[in-house]
Swiss-Prot record:
Keywords: Autophagy, Cytoplasm, Protein transport, Transport, Ubl conjugation pathway. The N-terminal region is involved in phosphatidylethanolamine-binding and is required for atg8-PE conjugation. The flexible region (FR) is required for atg7-binding. E2 conjugating enzyme required for the cytoplasm to vacuole transport (Cvt) and autophagy. Required for selective autophagic degradation of the nucleus (nucleophagy) as well as for mitophagy which contributes to regulate mitochondrial quantity and quality by eliminating the mitochondria to a basal level to fulfill cellular energy requirements and preventing excess ROS production. Responsible for the E2-like covalent binding of phosphatidylethanolamine to the C-terminal Gly of atg8. Coiled coil: none annotated. This is Autophagy-related protein 3. GO terms for molecular function: Atg8-family conjugating enzyme activity; Atg8-family ligase activity. The lineage of its organism: Eukaryota, Fungi, Dikarya, Ascomycota, Pezizomycotina. Residues 145-160 have a biased composition (Acidic residues). It comes from Emericella nidulans (strain FGSC A4 / ATCC 38163 / CBS 112.46 / NRRL 194 / M139) (Aspergillus nidulans).
Amino acid sequence: MNILHSTLSTWRDRLAPVSRTSTFRTTGQITPEEFVLAGDYLVYKFPSWSWGDASSPSKRVSYLPPGKQFLVTRGVPCHRRLNENFAGDAHLDDEIVRDFLSGGAGDSDGGDDNDGWLRTGGGGKRHESTIRDVRTVDESGKEEAEVEEEEDIPDMEDDDDEEAIIREPAGTTSTTQPTRTYNLYITYSNFYRTPRLYLSGYLSPSEPLPPKLMMEDIVGDYKDKTVTLEDFPWFDGSLQMASVHPCRHASVMKTLLDRADAALKLRREKIKQTAASSSPQEKAKLAQPESGLEGLVDDIKGLSLGDAQKQCQGDKGQAGGDEWEVLQHDEEEEVAIRVDQYLVVFLKFIASVTPGIEHDFTMGV
Protein backbone atom coordinates (compact mmCIF):
# COMPACT_ATOMS: atom_id res chain seq x y z
CA MET A 1 0.00 0.00 0.00
CA ASN A 2 2.86 2.37 0.87
CA ILE A 3 4.54 1.60 -2.47
CA LEU A 4 1.38 2.55 -4.37
CA HIS A 5 0.94 5.71 -2.30
CA SER A 6 4.59 6.72 -2.84
CA THR A 7 4.32 6.18 -6.59
CA LEU A 8 1.11 8.20 -6.90
CA SER A 9 2.53 10.99 -4.74
CA THR A 10 5.69 11.18 -6.85
CA TRP A 11 3.83 11.34 -10.15
CA ARG A 12 1.35 13.86 -8.78
CA ASP A 13 4.21 16.18 -7.86
CA ARG A 14 5.94 15.76 -11.21
CA LEU A 15 2.81 16.24 -13.32
CA ALA A 16 1.23 19.11 -11.39
CA PRO A 17 1.49 22.53 -13.08
CA VAL A 18 4.41 24.59 -11.82
CA SER A 19 3.47 27.90 -10.22
CA ARG A 20 5.71 30.90 -10.86
CA THR A 21 3.52 33.43 -9.03
CA SER A 22 4.47 34.25 -5.46
CA THR A 23 1.62 33.83 -2.96
CA PHE A 24 3.89 33.52 0.06
CA ARG A 25 2.15 36.17 2.17
CA THR A 26 -1.43 35.23 1.29
CA THR A 27 -1.35 31.41 1.20
CA GLY A 28 1.85 30.25 2.92
CA GLN A 29 2.87 28.49 -0.30
CA ILE A 30 6.13 29.09 -2.14
CA THR A 31 7.29 28.67 -5.73
CA PRO A 32 10.26 26.50 -6.77
CA GLU A 33 12.35 29.67 -7.15
CA GLU A 34 11.43 30.74 -3.61
CA PHE A 35 12.30 27.26 -2.35
CA VAL A 36 15.77 27.60 -3.86
CA LEU A 37 16.10 31.08 -2.38
CA ALA A 38 15.10 29.81 1.07
CA GLY A 39 17.42 26.83 0.67
CA ASP A 40 20.36 29.07 -0.20
CA TYR A 41 19.64 31.11 2.92
CA LEU A 42 19.48 27.99 5.11
CA VAL A 43 22.77 26.65 3.73
CA TYR A 44 24.44 30.05 4.14
CA LYS A 45 23.33 30.53 7.73
CA PHE A 46 23.63 26.91 8.88
CA PRO A 47 26.53 25.09 7.14
CA SER A 48 25.41 21.70 8.47
CA TRP A 49 22.76 21.88 5.74
CA SER A 50 23.76 21.43 2.11
CA TRP A 51 22.16 21.01 -1.28
CA GLY A 52 21.88 17.51 -2.75
CA ASP A 53 21.30 16.07 -6.20
CA ALA A 54 19.31 13.10 -7.42
CA SER A 55 21.18 9.82 -7.77
CA SER A 56 20.60 9.90 -11.53
CA PRO A 57 19.36 12.49 -14.06
CA SER A 58 16.12 10.55 -14.52
CA LYS A 59 15.27 11.12 -10.87
CA ARG A 60 15.59 14.90 -11.09
CA VAL A 61 12.59 17.20 -11.27
CA SER A 62 12.55 19.80 -14.02
CA TYR A 63 11.36 22.69 -11.86
CA LEU A 64 14.51 22.63 -9.67
CA PRO A 65 18.08 23.13 -10.93
CA PRO A 66 20.56 20.22 -11.01
CA GLY A 67 22.53 20.06 -7.80
CA LYS A 68 19.70 21.72 -5.87
CA GLN A 69 17.07 19.01 -5.91
CA PHE A 70 16.79 18.79 -2.12
CA LEU A 71 18.44 19.92 1.11
CA VAL A 72 20.12 17.48 3.48
CA THR A 73 21.77 17.42 6.90
CA ARG A 74 23.37 14.25 8.26
CA GLY A 75 24.04 12.69 11.63
CA VAL A 76 21.42 14.52 13.69
CA PRO A 77 21.32 12.83 17.13
CA CYS A 78 18.22 11.32 18.72
CA HIS A 79 18.83 10.22 22.31
CA ARG A 80 15.38 9.03 23.42
CA ARG A 81 12.38 7.07 22.25
CA LEU A 82 8.86 8.52 22.44
CA ASN A 83 6.92 5.87 24.32
CA GLU A 84 3.82 6.15 26.50
CA ASN A 85 5.94 7.71 29.27
CA PHE A 86 7.00 10.61 27.05
CA ALA A 87 6.98 13.92 28.95
CA GLY A 88 6.34 12.30 32.27
CA ASP A 89 2.72 11.07 32.47
CA ALA A 90 2.24 7.45 31.52
CA HIS A 91 -0.84 6.34 29.60
CA LEU A 92 -2.04 9.89 29.05
CA ASP A 93 -2.84 11.46 25.74
CA ASP A 94 -0.50 14.02 24.23
CA GLU A 95 -1.89 17.52 24.47
CA ILE A 96 -2.05 18.98 21.00
CA VAL A 97 -2.22 22.75 21.14
CA ARG A 98 -3.69 24.07 17.91
CA ASP A 99 -2.91 20.80 16.13
CA PHE A 100 -2.40 22.11 12.60
CA LEU A 101 -0.54 19.12 11.23
CA SER A 102 -3.26 16.56 11.86
CA GLY A 103 -5.93 18.84 10.44
CA GLY A 104 -7.59 19.99 13.63
CA ALA A 105 -8.37 23.68 14.17
CA GLY A 106 -6.05 24.95 11.53
CA ASP A 107 -7.61 28.40 11.28
CA SER A 108 -5.86 31.41 12.62
CA ASP A 109 -8.86 32.49 14.68
CA GLY A 110 -8.86 31.89 18.40
CA GLY A 111 -6.33 30.12 20.53
CA ASP A 112 -4.14 33.19 20.86
CA ASP A 113 -2.43 31.91 23.96
CA ASN A 114 -0.45 29.12 22.34
CA ASP A 115 0.86 30.64 19.09
CA GLY A 116 0.02 27.50 17.17
CA TRP A 117 2.72 25.29 18.67
CA LEU A 118 2.53 21.73 19.96
CA ARG A 119 2.87 20.59 23.56
CA THR A 120 3.35 16.85 23.81
CA GLY A 121 3.10 14.37 26.61
CA GLY A 122 0.63 14.05 29.38
CA GLY A 123 -1.42 17.16 28.92
CA GLY A 124 -4.59 15.94 27.30
CA LYS A 125 -6.01 14.44 30.49
CA ARG A 126 -4.58 16.42 33.35
CA HIS A 127 -4.68 14.96 36.84
CA GLU A 128 -5.73 17.31 39.55
CA SER A 129 -3.39 16.44 42.39
CA THR A 130 -5.12 16.14 45.73
CA ILE A 131 -3.58 15.80 49.16
CA ARG A 132 -5.23 13.10 51.18
CA ASP A 133 -5.44 13.00 54.97
CA VAL A 134 -2.47 11.27 56.52
CA ARG A 135 -3.36 9.05 59.47
CA THR A 136 -0.96 7.37 61.86
CA VAL A 137 -1.23 3.87 63.29
CA ASP A 138 -0.39 2.89 66.86
CA GLU A 139 1.59 -0.19 67.91
CA SER A 140 -1.53 -2.37 68.00
CA GLY A 141 -2.35 -1.48 64.42
CA LYS A 142 -5.31 0.77 65.20
CA GLU A 143 -5.75 3.99 63.30
CA GLU A 144 -5.35 7.04 65.47
CA ALA A 145 -7.80 9.92 65.50
CA GLU A 146 -7.57 12.62 62.86
CA VAL A 147 -5.24 15.42 63.89
CA GLU A 148 -5.75 19.10 63.34
CA GLU A 149 -4.61 20.45 59.97
CA GLU A 150 -2.08 22.85 61.47
CA GLU A 151 -0.36 19.94 63.20
CA ASP A 152 0.33 18.17 59.90
CA ILE A 153 3.73 19.77 59.55
CA PRO A 154 6.44 17.39 58.32
CA ASP A 155 9.53 16.99 60.42
CA MET A 156 12.57 18.22 58.51
CA GLU A 157 14.69 15.59 60.25
CA ASP A 158 12.73 12.87 58.47
CA ASP A 159 14.46 13.87 55.25
CA ASP A 160 17.70 12.48 56.66
CA ASP A 161 16.29 8.99 57.11
CA GLU A 162 18.22 6.86 54.63
CA GLU A 163 15.62 4.09 54.85
CA ALA A 164 12.95 6.53 53.63
CA ILE A 165 14.76 7.18 50.38
CA ILE A 166 12.99 5.69 47.37
CA ARG A 167 15.60 4.53 44.95
CA GLU A 168 14.96 4.11 41.23
CA PRO A 169 15.16 0.49 40.12
CA ALA A 170 18.26 -0.39 38.18
CA GLY A 171 18.00 -0.30 34.42
CA THR A 172 15.04 2.10 34.26
CA THR A 173 16.89 5.27 33.28
CA SER A 174 16.46 6.68 29.81
CA THR A 175 20.25 6.86 29.37
CA THR A 176 20.31 3.14 28.58
CA GLN A 177 18.63 3.84 25.25
CA PRO A 178 21.13 3.81 22.39
CA THR A 179 21.57 7.05 20.52
CA ARG A 180 20.26 7.03 16.98
CA THR A 181 21.19 9.44 14.23
CA TYR A 182 19.06 10.77 11.41
CA ASN A 183 19.64 12.22 8.00
CA LEU A 184 17.02 14.90 7.31
CA TYR A 185 15.96 15.76 3.76
CA ILE A 186 13.87 18.78 2.76
CA THR A 187 12.29 18.48 -0.67
CA TYR A 188 9.82 20.62 -2.59
CA SER A 189 6.28 19.33 -3.11
CA ASN A 190 5.10 20.81 -6.39
CA PHE A 191 1.52 19.67 -5.82
CA TYR A 192 1.17 21.34 -2.41
CA ARG A 193 3.77 24.06 -3.19
CA THR A 194 5.44 23.65 0.18
CA PRO A 195 8.57 21.96 1.55
CA ARG A 196 8.39 18.33 2.63
CA LEU A 197 10.55 16.57 5.22
CA TYR A 198 11.96 13.03 4.93
CA LEU A 199 13.87 11.25 7.72
CA SER A 200 16.29 8.34 7.40
CA GLY A 201 17.52 6.78 10.66
CA TYR A 202 20.68 4.89 11.63
CA LEU A 203 21.53 2.71 14.62
CA SER A 204 25.21 3.23 13.82
CA PRO A 205 27.07 4.87 10.92
CA SER A 206 27.01 1.56 9.05
CA GLU A 207 23.67 0.14 10.24
CA PRO A 208 20.46 1.68 8.85
CA LEU A 209 17.47 1.83 11.17
CA PRO A 210 14.58 -0.37 9.97
CA PRO A 211 11.79 1.92 8.72
CA LYS A 212 9.22 0.63 11.23
CA LEU A 213 11.51 1.55 14.14
CA MET A 214 11.66 5.16 12.93
CA MET A 215 8.09 5.52 14.15
CA GLU A 216 9.38 5.18 17.72
CA ASP A 217 10.73 8.71 17.32
CA ILE A 218 7.45 10.19 16.06
CA VAL A 219 4.81 11.71 18.36
CA GLY A 220 2.02 9.14 18.75
CA ASP A 221 -0.81 11.22 17.29
CA TYR A 222 1.09 11.56 14.01
CA LYS A 223 2.15 7.95 13.40
CA ASP A 224 0.73 6.51 10.18
CA LYS A 225 -1.42 9.64 9.78
CA THR A 226 0.61 12.76 9.20
CA VAL A 227 3.85 10.75 9.14
CA THR A 228 4.06 7.72 6.86
CA LEU A 229 6.78 5.48 5.44
CA GLU A 230 7.44 6.24 1.79
CA ASP A 231 10.16 5.75 -0.81
CA PHE A 232 12.48 8.69 -1.33
CA PRO A 233 11.83 9.61 -4.98
CA TRP A 234 15.25 11.18 -5.68
CA PHE A 235 17.23 7.97 -5.14
CA ASP A 236 17.40 4.89 -7.33
CA GLY A 237 15.98 1.76 -5.81
CA SER A 238 13.50 1.55 -2.99
CA LEU A 239 14.79 3.44 0.05
CA GLN A 240 12.02 3.90 2.59
CA MET A 241 12.02 6.94 4.86
CA ALA A 242 9.60 8.48 7.31
CA SER A 243 7.92 11.47 5.68
CA VAL A 244 5.81 14.28 7.11
CA HIS A 245 2.89 14.76 4.74
CA PRO A 246 2.72 18.35 3.44
CA CYS A 247 -1.06 18.72 3.08
CA ARG A 248 -1.29 21.10 6.08
CA HIS A 249 2.06 22.86 5.75
CA ALA A 250 0.76 25.91 3.85
CA SER A 251 -2.00 26.69 6.36
CA VAL A 252 0.41 26.25 9.28
CA MET A 253 2.98 28.56 7.71
CA LYS A 254 0.34 31.16 6.80
CA THR A 255 -0.88 31.24 10.41
CA LEU A 256 2.66 31.49 11.78
CA LEU A 257 3.51 34.29 9.34
CA ASP A 258 0.40 36.25 10.33
CA ARG A 259 1.08 35.80 14.01
CA ALA A 260 4.73 36.70 13.61
CA ASP A 261 3.69 39.94 11.90
CA ALA A 262 1.27 40.63 14.76
CA ALA A 263 4.00 39.90 17.31
CA LEU A 264 6.39 42.25 15.51
CA LYS A 265 3.73 44.96 15.45
CA LEU A 266 3.20 44.50 19.18
CA ARG A 267 6.94 44.67 19.71
CA ARG A 268 7.13 47.98 17.86
CA GLU A 269 4.28 49.39 19.91
CA LYS A 270 6.19 48.47 23.05
CA ILE A 271 9.27 50.24 21.71
CA LYS A 272 7.26 53.37 20.99
CA GLN A 273 5.71 53.35 24.44
CA THR A 274 9.06 52.80 26.10
CA ALA A 275 10.67 55.54 24.02
CA ALA A 276 8.21 57.98 25.53
CA SER A 277 8.89 56.73 29.03
CA SER A 278 11.78 57.76 31.23
CA SER A 279 11.58 54.64 33.38
CA PRO A 280 14.83 52.60 33.27
CA GLN A 281 12.92 49.55 34.52
CA GLU A 282 10.62 49.51 31.49
CA LYS A 283 13.57 49.89 29.12
CA ALA A 284 15.41 47.04 30.82
CA LYS A 285 12.29 44.85 30.62
CA LEU A 286 11.96 45.50 26.89
CA ALA A 287 15.58 44.54 26.35
CA GLN A 288 14.98 41.06 27.79
CA PRO A 289 14.44 38.17 25.32
CA GLU A 290 10.81 37.43 24.52
CA SER A 291 9.14 34.04 24.49
CA GLY A 292 6.62 32.56 22.07
CA LEU A 293 6.26 34.11 18.63
CA GLU A 294 7.76 37.41 19.78
CA GLY A 295 10.89 35.47 20.68
CA LEU A 296 10.81 33.77 17.31
CA VAL A 297 10.60 37.16 15.63
CA ASP A 298 13.66 38.28 17.57
CA ASP A 299 15.52 35.14 16.50
CA ILE A 300 14.58 35.59 12.85
CA LYS A 301 15.45 39.27 12.88
CA GLY A 302 18.84 38.32 14.26
CA LEU A 303 19.44 36.20 11.17
CA SER A 304 18.86 39.04 8.71
CA LEU A 305 21.63 39.32 6.14
CA GLY A 306 21.29 43.09 6.17
CA ASP A 307 21.60 43.53 9.92
CA ALA A 308 25.26 44.50 9.84
CA GLN A 309 24.64 47.14 7.20
CA LYS A 310 21.64 48.56 9.09
CA GLN A 311 23.62 48.64 12.31
CA CYS A 312 26.44 50.49 10.59
CA GLN A 313 24.05 53.03 9.13
CA GLY A 314 22.36 53.43 12.52
CA ASP A 315 25.69 54.10 14.24
CA LYS A 316 26.50 56.84 11.75
CA GLY A 317 23.11 58.52 11.97
CA GLN A 318 22.59 58.17 15.67
CA ALA A 319 25.43 60.45 16.78
CA GLY A 320 24.85 59.69 20.43
CA GLY A 321 21.05 59.71 20.18
CA ASP A 322 18.65 57.67 22.25
CA GLU A 323 18.98 53.90 21.65
CA TRP A 324 15.19 53.64 22.03
CA GLU A 325 14.61 55.77 18.96
CA VAL A 326 11.25 55.15 17.33
CA LEU A 327 11.43 53.04 14.16
CA GLN A 328 11.33 54.79 10.83
CA HIS A 329 8.32 54.48 8.53
CA ASP A 330 10.04 52.14 6.06
CA GLU A 331 11.02 49.81 8.90
CA GLU A 332 7.44 49.73 10.15
CA GLU A 333 6.34 48.38 6.76
CA GLU A 334 8.85 45.52 7.00
CA VAL A 335 7.41 42.03 7.55
CA ALA A 336 8.54 39.81 10.41
CA ILE A 337 9.61 36.87 8.25
CA ARG A 338 10.89 37.15 4.69
CA VAL A 339 10.44 34.46 2.08
CA ASP A 340 14.14 33.53 2.20
CA GLN A 341 13.70 32.78 5.93
CA TYR A 342 10.81 30.40 5.22
CA LEU A 343 12.70 27.17 5.90
CA VAL A 344 14.00 28.40 9.25
CA VAL A 345 10.43 28.78 10.51
CA PHE A 346 9.40 25.57 8.74
CA LEU A 347 11.98 23.57 10.69
CA LYS A 348 10.92 25.21 13.94
CA PHE A 349 7.34 23.99 13.72
CA ILE A 350 8.15 20.63 12.08
CA ALA A 351 10.36 19.79 15.09
CA SER A 352 7.18 19.27 17.14
CA VAL A 353 6.55 16.05 15.21
CA THR A 354 9.91 14.57 16.27
CA PRO A 355 10.82 16.22 19.59
CA GLY A 356 13.37 13.51 20.35
CA ILE A 357 15.47 14.48 17.33
CA GLU A 358 17.72 17.42 18.13
CA HIS A 359 16.81 19.74 15.27
CA ASP A 360 18.64 22.57 17.02
CA PHE A 361 21.80 20.52 16.44
CA THR A 362 21.56 21.73 12.83
CA MET A 363 20.52 25.30 13.63
CA GLY A 364 21.86 27.93 15.93
CA VAL A 365 18.56 29.84 16.26
